[in-house]
Amino acid sequence: MDTKTLAESYFTAVNKGGWEEFVAENFNYGMCDSQEIRQGRDVYLQGAGQFYALNQHLEVKKLLVEGREVAALNRYRLQSPQGNQLELDVAEFLKFDESDKLIASTIYFDTHRFQEFMQGK
């Protein structure tokens, strides 16, 4: 499958379910709040899973593809456990391997705004 179609399919699965099927066992995960690269599928499934559980809808605003790498600007409509809602723009950088599995993801977003949202402010 071509990389653009893979990325679109992954983001569709974030909305509809099944995104976990895209993730390789050998996975690198980076976040904007740390320079540490977390490794392993389970780490990503836990971290992304907590975030995606808040997702009401993901809209891909811009998608750039080069080889097996993707840069995406996405808008997430989130709902907190307390019922608060937030639209959050997230820059996501993905990498797929030759077997069409997602092997790396690094995300950037306004962590302060997200923390306030989660605290009900």
Which residues fall in each region the model found?
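A short hydrophobic beta-strand element
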Residues: 67-76, 88
